[in-house]
Amino acid sequence: MPQETAPEIYLIARPAVDREAMRAYLSAVGGESWLERRDSPGPGGDGELLVEFAGRTCYRSWEPGLNPNVTRVREDPRAYLNNILKSAHGSVLEHANYTFALHNVSRVATHEIVRHRAGAAYSQESLRYVRLVDIGFRVPPVLEPVRQQVLELVERLEEFQVSAAMALHLDEEGIPFHVKKEVTSALRRLAPIGLSTDIIMTMNLRTLRHVVQMRTAAGAEEELRLIFGRVGEIMKAEASGVFQDFERDQRGCWEPGFPKV
């Protein structure tokens, strides 16, 4: 029988700030006292530090007096980020990127995920190069009444992948790689679109806010709700200031207090 899988979500990369370079810049513009106040690690890490740095650059709001138009400076990072969200100054969120490894997600899911192009980058396991031997598969909850039939069908498709590769002599010595690639590419057409695959996904904070909201909405595709429900949990903990307005309702929808940022 095919291997039954479930999506696994890993946050594998987050922003890292060069504090010495940041300090040198701030010294040049007269804002070094801000970093002294702000340099203690906060719950939002370097991602939120970078967002705040970008935002304060726009108004030269490192401290009162640097910009004659600025008479009051929010010193609390969370309050500052809340004002960024409230004023829809979303461009500064685009400086901070986070990378996720999505393991055992279906190609149904990845086909929808990669439609989010702005502020995102993807690298997906290629079935043109990676030959299918074991087909991982997750039975969607709505198909539970016909689970056995689903798994038997996937098993037959898996057996075909193996038998076809044998019949086409793919593992015989001396078969050129370009031949293996051509056959592997052809065989993927006989694989279920629901098979499990992996994709690396990078998104900036602005995009993450948008996608988490859209893909956990009540009408979103079931597996996408599962994947981005978990992404929402991770980002609520990872960037608690930028996601401070997000709340999860009883339906599992992540809803922001400020939807247009």
Residue positions per predicted region:
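Family-specific signature for flavin-dependent thymidylate synthase
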Residues: 1-261
